[in-house]
């Protein structure tokens, strides 16, 4: 899914809302997010330029239950680059290694920094 679409990523942080009610269960839940290069870092234009808006992918999220934030992105999060999606690009496609499915390993801490961009709701249908 190419969400949230194309926008000026150097000025705005595109935001979308997802209804995950059917996925939340009583007890402990796990939230996994797969980030791709998308419009932010993919090859663009006839020159094949990359990283037009930056080199590092990032996520800002908040999970709410009954209108109350129960999980917010922060420095306690962990990340890994060892999943089955090895490479992805809007023009060059995706390299997927099915041998790595379910083998997420190499978790490490994440770098946090304050958001300085204007959070902008995207004009796309929530998924």
PLM region descriptions:
Residues 1-102, 107:
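Accessory beta-strand-rich segments of carbohydrate-active enzymes
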Residues 107, 111-127:
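Edge strands and adjacent loops of beta-rich recognition modules
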């Amino acid at each position: 899914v190419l969400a949230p679409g194309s926008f000026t990523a150097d000025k705005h942080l595109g935001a979308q809302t997802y209804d995950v009610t059917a996925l939340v269960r009583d007890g402990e839940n796990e939230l996994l997010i797969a980030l791709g290069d998308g419009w932010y870092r993919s090859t663009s234009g006839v020159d094949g330029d990359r990283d037009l808006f930056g080199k590092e992918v990032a996520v800002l999220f908040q999970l709410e239950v009954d209108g109350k934030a129960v999980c917010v992105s922060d420095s306690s999060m962990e990340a890994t680059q060892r999943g089955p999606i090895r490479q992805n690009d809007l023009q060059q496609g995706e390299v997927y290694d099915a041998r790595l499915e379910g083998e997420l390993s190499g978790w490490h801490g994440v770098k946090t920094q304050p958001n300085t961009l204007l959070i902008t709701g995207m004009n796309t249908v929530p998924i």
